A protein has these predicted regions:
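Conserved CoA-thioester-binding segment of acyl-CoA-metabolizing enzymes
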Residues: 2-92
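Glycine- (often His-adjacent) and acidic-residue-rich active-site loop
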Residues: 80-127
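Short beta-strand/loop segments at the ligand-binding rim of alpha/beta enzyme cores
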Residues: 130
Length: 130
């Protein structure tokens, strides 16, 4: 089996000018059936250790919908973006898949809003992909 690069598509979900989830689809160049695509999803908030905010959750849900509607996708790999190199004299941030929830987003919100955020779980949709 040979993997051949065919396309890169970036989810349109942005947070403060950055794409929070990058989606890359790679063609499986295989002469035997079924062929198809490997979809690589990169959590792209390295300055926040790829922590998940509401925009990340929305992007993951959109990516799940895209994957469910594309019968060519055979495998999904989810990874975290590499850390940004530190400024001179600053300590480097550690590499991470995802640091968890970005709790800074909950400042000033009431407990009902926070509970709603966690009840509408994007990871549950990821686990249910078929």
């Amino acid at each position: 089996m040979i993997l051949a690069y065919i396309q890169t598509s970036i989810m349109s979900r942005r947070c403060m000018g950055e794409e929070v989830l990058l989606v890359e689809n790679i063609q499986i160049d295989d002469t035997s059936p079924p062929g198809g695509l490997v979809s690589i999803w990169t959590l792209n908030r390295p300055n926040k250790l790829n922590s998940l905010n509401s925009e990340s959750h929305k992007a993951l849900k959109e990516a799940c919908e895209m994957a469910e509607s594309n019968d060519l996708i055979r495998v999904i790999v989810i990874r975290g973006a590499s850390p940004i190199p530190p400024l001179e004299g600053k300590r480097a941030k550690p590499a991470s898949f995802a640091a968890g929830a970005d709790i800074s987003e909950f400042l000033g919100k009431n407990s009902d809003d926070v509970r709603d955020f966690f009840e509408d779980n994007a990871w549950e949709r990821v686990w249910k992909l078929s």
